[in-house]
């Protein structure tokens, strides 16, 4: 009896120690996924429109299936999606960032972002940044013209998306999204700095008011239309209080505790002919 009791004690002790070791390993694994260092790599992916019809897909339009496969790949490979607030919280010491973090962005605010992307973000517990052209959303809010093909999100759509916790709304200008008289928010040829400052400020502030009124949250990031900017543009955007800017330049980003690391972030356009795996390999090769 005594020997049996001893055996039981040995077995119990072994099981207990195994459990302790397992918990320690699991806890360590969780800790390893959080970056407590002074810098974090951040690839930013740029999407625009999501449509099922292959005939309508192009350099800026991919299928909802491709987007879902992207989310699956990211989840299966340990990536965590972040938004601008996560970055600013990290910079100012309010939180850590995941070691393998990535930002997904949608430009222009197409209605199909609401129709296709939002349910998929909810399904895979992912977040994204959507930057609508405020004047276009204003128009579709007034006309109530709903179309997955050509429509844009309304202010009510923005509110719902923002409240979901899966989408962050940022500023993409009110109506400076053209290649005609000027390229995006760039100055016109021969335009004085004073005139340019007045026009840019009026446009961006108007967009800020509409977006904040719609969501109850003030945008903190300016997303350059076409990625077009110059030194004066960046200076004026900073003076308006934006803590982050996004470009269309394909380059890797290193986020540090320095607030300046959030300006002029590079983004990689999501090409439908490239796998997410290859895209991320490209970002690593450029790091």
Where are the language model's segments positioned?
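Substrate-binding cleft of extracellular glycoside hydrolase catalytic domains
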Residues: 86, 105-110, 123-126
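Extracellular/periplasmic catalytic domains that process cell-envelope and extracellular macromolecules
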Residues: 36-40, 95-98, 122-125, 161-164, ...
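Metal-dependent polysaccharide deacetylase catalytic core of the NodB/CE4 family, i.e.
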Residues: 45, 49-52, 57, 100-102, ...
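Membrane-embedded segments
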Residues: 90, 99, 105, 109-117
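Active-site environment of divalent metal-dependent phosphoester hydrolases
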Residues: 111-113, 176-178, 226-232, 252-255
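N-terminal Lys/Arg-rich, disordered targeting/topogenic segments
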Residues: 1-7
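N-terminal pre-catalytic segment of deacetylase/amide-hydrolase enzymes
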Residues: 8-16, 20-102, 263, 267-271, ...
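A cross-kingdom marker for long, charged
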Residues: 229-232, 236, 244, 249-281
């Amino acid at each position: 009896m005594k020997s049996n009791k001893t055996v039981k004690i040995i077995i119990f002790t072994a099981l207990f120690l195994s459990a302790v070791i397992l918990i320690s390993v699991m806890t360590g694994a969780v800790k390893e996924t959080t970056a407590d260092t002074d810098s974090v790599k951040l690839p930013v992916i740029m999407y625009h429109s999501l449509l099922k019809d292959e005939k309508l897909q192009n350099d800026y339009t991919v299928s909802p299936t491709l987007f879902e496969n992207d989310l699956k790949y990211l989840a299966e490979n340990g990536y965590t999606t972040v938004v601008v607030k996560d970055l600013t919280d990290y910079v100012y010491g309010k939180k850590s960032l995941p070691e393998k973090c990535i930002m997904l962005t949608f430009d222009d605010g197409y209605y199909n972002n609401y129709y296709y992307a939002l349910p998929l973000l909810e399904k895979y517990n992912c977040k994204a940044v959507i930057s609508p052209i405020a004047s276009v959303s204003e128009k579709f809010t007034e006309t109530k013209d709903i179309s997955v093909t050509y429509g844009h999100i309304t202010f009510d759509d923005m509110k719902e998306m923002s409240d979901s916790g899966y989408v962050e709304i940022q500023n993409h200008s009110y109506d400076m999204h053209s290649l005609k008289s000027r390229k995006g928010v760039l100055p016109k040829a021969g335009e004085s700095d004073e005139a340019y400052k007045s026009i840019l400020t009026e446009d961006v502030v108007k967009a800020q008011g509409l977006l904040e009124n719609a969501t109850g949250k003030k945008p903190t990031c300016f997303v350059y239309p076409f990625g077009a900017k110059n030194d004066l543009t960046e200076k004026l955007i900073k003076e308006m209080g934006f803590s982050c800017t996004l470009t269309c330049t394909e380059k890797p980003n290193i986020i540090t505790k320095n607030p300046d690391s959030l300006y002029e972030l590079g983004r990689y356009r999501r090409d439908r002919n490239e796998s997410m795996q290859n895209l991320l390999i490209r970002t690593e090769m450029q790091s």
